[in-house]
Amino acid sequence: MELLVFVSSTCAHCPKAEQVVRIVCPEYSEYGLTYEKVRTRSQRGSELSEKYMVMSVPTLIFLNDKGIEINRIIGVPSEIGLRNKIEILLGIKETFLKKIFGNKKKWTKLIY
């Protein structure tokens, strides 16, 4: 999984978002998480911003192994919030509803 961190040099909140990513993401490198800082005013940044329809910065976009967007965060995430999101997307942590209701297939069998 890859995390693209869209930032701009004129953005007041982007340095904080970058700091949170630099602190949290290395903890998940053993799970295959990589991250890349994307400057929206660069050639590549402009192309990626258009491709993923980034309208504001900071924006964090999670991509699966095929490069398809699976989630995004707009704004500055907290360290805890980013950890939770990463763990859910990597399958390390179950969502609250999954903890309560369990596997959807199991419930489907009970209902029908």
Regions found by a protein language model. Name each.
Residues 45-47, 61, 80:
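A broad, structure-centric signal for solvent-exposed, well-ordered loop/edge residues
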Residues 23-31:
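Short helix-loop-beta junction
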